[in-house]
Amino acid sequence: MSAVSSQELAGLDVFADIPAQDLEALAVHLQPLRAAAGEVLMRQGEIAASFSIITSGRVEIRHVAPEGQDVVTELLPGSIVGEIALLRNQPRTATVLAKDDVCGYRGYNRAFECMLAMPVVAERMVCTARQRLAAYIAPIPVLTGHGDGLFLRPVLPGDAERFHSSGSFSRQTLYRRYQGGAPTEARLAYLFEVDYVDHFVWVVTDGGDGPAVADARFVRDEDDPTSAEVALTVADAYQGRGLGTLLLVALAIAARVDGIRRFHARVLSDNPPARALGEKVNARWGQEEYGVITTAGDIPDLDDLPLDYDTRLRIEQVARQVIHAFD
């Protein structure tokens, strides 16, 4: 009899909506895990043989980049750690340290195969792994002609809180962007916890660890994988600095990397900034319904985008790192 209960597994968020009986094969291949506060569970650079599911206690994820800077993240109970190296078949990307006394489960190859055999679980793991890898990427400094210390990077889950608490977006800006009021908590989770493949988001921050002051995204069409809807938002105090154009170009670069060839958008007809931005890229507007206009067009070749070569190349490299992290 397994020392791990499938009923206990079914209570974890990562296995939400999966019946306990469907987790019995996985439970057989898991072992109980206990670690004291301060104990190292995994080390960056080592060959990966296992993953862990944390059910109680916090763990610290510490990644040392090639340039020497540390990226530290704290994970709460319900998290999976060690899965990135197994998914990529590469050495571990970070060190995992128990911040509290930790309990959970440890699994090896057979257990990981059981995880991957459940499509919903595999999709959740890959999405979370992409988000963690995105956190290791150094933000790209951007110049807007105002001497700002602004940075461009892929969105991270914590950006939902940065967006919600920054107070940089007026009611009018939020209304124009979301065609209604401020987004709900559930809506924010959708907007900022993305998979980077079918839903990709860039954010601009004021300072390396500062608030998110602009974001831009594309969401791939279900009926046409080469087409995507785009949307962007720029905080009021940062409008008129060229951020909208920069973000649209960055989206075009990421979309090309992701196999998308055509963009379309829906905006309120009383949204002058969006219309002005569209006219810069020769958008042709059409009426869809009262108060809403649409535009669509092919994404230009990268060589035709209005951005210097070095910045364009860096944006392309970053996009490729997250979009093709598991290719």
Model-derived segments and spans:
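Regulatory nucleotide-sensing modules
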Residues: 6-66, 81
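Conserved acetyl-CoA-binding loop-helix of GNAT-fold acetyltransferases
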Residues: 234, 240-255, 280
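Cyclic-nucleotide recognition modules
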Residues: 72-127
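A short, internal acetyl-CoA/4′-phosphopantetheine-binding micro-motif in the GNAT/acyltransferase core
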Residues: 81, 97, 222, 231-240, ...
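Acetyl-CoA-dependent GNAT
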Residues: 180-229, 235
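Terminal substrate-recognition subdomain of acyl/acetyltransferases
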Residues: 114, 123, 128-134, 138-148, ...
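Conserved GNAT acetyl-CoA-binding A-motif
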Residues: 255-268
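A short beta-loop-alpha structural element at the N-terminal edge
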Residues: 151-165
